[in-house]
Amino acid sequence: MLFRFLALLPFVAGAFAEYKVHDDTFKPDYVLEATLDDIKINCVSRSSIVFNGTSPGPTIYLQEEQTTWIRVYNKIPDNNVTVHWHGLSQRAAPFSDGTPLVSQWPIPAGQFFDYEIRPEIGDAGSYFYHSHVGFQIVTAFGALIVRDARKPEYKYDGDIPLLVGDNYAAEDEVIEQGLLADPFKWSGEPQAITIQGNSGNKSFYEAPDSSCMPHVVHVDPGKTYRLRFISATALSMIKLGIEDHENLTVIEADGSYTKPAKIDHVQVSPGQRYSYLMKTKTSKEVCGGDKSQYWIRYESRDRPKVISGYALLKYRCDKNQKLPKSLPETSPIELSNSTADYLEYALEGLSEKNNQAFPKLSEVTRTVVIQINQILTTGAYVNGTLNGTVAWAQNGLPWKENVQAERRQVPYLIQIYENGTTPNYTLALEHHGFDPETKAFPAKVGEVLDIVWENNNGPTGGWDYHPMHVHGYHVYDLGSGNGTYNATENEAHFENFTPVLRDTTNLYRYAVKGVPHHTAGWRAWRIRITEENIGAWMMHCHIAQHQVMGMATVWVFGDAEQIRGKFPAPPYTQGYLTYGGSAYGTEDDQPWVNEYYSDKNN
């Protein structure tokens, strides 16, 4: 037998859990309703899965050291849904990461689930929430801001979240079916890129409705603003510049405060978040003259076609300037085509605690190298055409949500909890870190891993870029480069520099096309496995199409005894162990919920 089965172990639960029915007296802090609605995006009606009727959904505000309850209703006919708290996986209660078939069962149609989240000191920053089922993320997302419990690390006068999204005219189901079909059908590029739901493709006076107008960012003169760029795009990496406002300072990346880093433009990929400080012009400069409005230009990068749009930075002046009659004939901002050098080896964490905890190369116990490329699971590549079923694979092995669902897979975390089933560590060492039986990567508490993603161009010879995202605790981002990873050479960067903790960084491409099956490009992470980050976590490409096609991995940190010791004993968790169990409420049945954190029990 290739799995280890451990006998049920005693649990110490009472100290950190209460088992309660969430009846009519329970009042969640936020309510999200997932529905299938016809909404206008890019001035076209689209049947879309949304939260609370809009895309993006409402902004959620959390605070460090406070527990927040968020109730999610699934009112989508015949569809599951989950919500993933992107960048805050480690702060969600057990069975609440939002990853179906990994950390929890999805929420069935007609039911609801109460998510419990508690950020800690050091988590203040920019995040977002989104569905983690199929292609739903393309419209089912919203901003999530964690506020500082203490005085913020940087001073600013205003705080402006800006969510970036992709717009596809085709509906989710059509796109997903094409990606999984035989023969495979690619989704194509998005029809538009949106900021705060606006595509910026039409002028204020020509647009049939506001959804294709530029989004307007209102500012006051002589102030400093924190611009939080949050990318919920399905596919697009964007470059963005603000006319006549090139002096930006990065102060945060993926929820981690950074030492200030000067830059003249924004670059953000699916799943990434950056905060930039921008000082506005004086009142004399803008309100005393004839120009108080400035174009914001954004363009996609590293894709076959450039998708672009505009937003507008508008100053508040006593003399109100009318909105521009038309979009610029030529862009007033020139954006670089170079992507792979953006802030590489430039972002150092502000947290002295995290900087001191950075493991050196001499502490690394194991390096796991994962080569990413396309494979054909049926058919063949003939005359430049992928004629068959296409998957994205890690070391030759795809992980597809639909395949696992068809196999009626029980979520990994629940398998561990109920049966003590964990990946076989010895077998994994024989297969480049991967256990082929459980289809998971195991790691032991005490290990320090270097995880190296390699970009291979597969049978077509074409490279893509991949924004790689880690669930659970963030990783020290070791940088990236062309060719393959050389640990000794790369470690030289860290003699007087400590990389910041991140959860989403790019595996870049360094050429468009080359000799097939060639590896050129790497991204490396470092993580220490401790008692704090034990659990079952995903690491995957945050391009939604690639994840649907199999570019995902599951990691199990810790052994069964350690993982199960993190959970309360039955009956506290009984309702989480089956699909639609008693932890999932209905119109007629109130849920029985494990209140995991102790500072707030409604």
Swiss-Prot record:
Q: Which PANTHER family match?
A: FI03373P-RELATED, MULTI-COPPER OXIDASE
Which residues get glycosylated? 52, 80, 201, 247, 337, 383, 387, 419, 424, 482, 486
Question: Where, if anywhere, are coiled coils annotated?
Answer: none
| Species of origin | Gibberella zeae (strain ATCC MYA-4620 / CBS 123657 / FGSC 9075 / NRRL 31084 / PH-1)
Triggers of expression:
Expression is regulated by the aurofusarin biosynthesis cluster-specific transcription factor aurR1/GIP2.
Q: Which Pfam families match?
A: Cu-oxidase, Cu-oxidase_2, Cu-oxidase_3
Name of the gene encoding the protein in the UniProt record: aurL2
Q: Which residues bind Cu cation 3?
A: 132
Q: Which family does it belong to?
A: Belongs to the multicopper oxidase family.
Q: Which SUPFAM superfamilies match?
A: Cupredoxins (SSF49503)
Positions bound to Cu cation 4:
469
Q: Which domain of life is it from?
A: Eukaryota
Question: What is this protein's function per UniProt?
Answer: Multicopper oxidase; part of the gene cluster that mediates the biosynthesis of aurofusarin, a red mycelium pigment which is acting as a mycotoxin. The first step is performed by the polyketide synthase which condenses one acetyl-CoA and 6 malonyl-CoA units to form the first intermediate, the cyclic heptaketide and yellow pigment YWA1. The C2 hydroxyl group in the pyrone ring of YWA1 is probably formed during ring closure by an aldol-type cyclization reaction.
This protein is called what? Multicopper oxidase aurL2
Record bears the keyword Chaperone? no
Q: Where does Cu cation 1 bind?
A: 84
Pathway assigned to this chain's UniProt record? Pigment biosynthesis
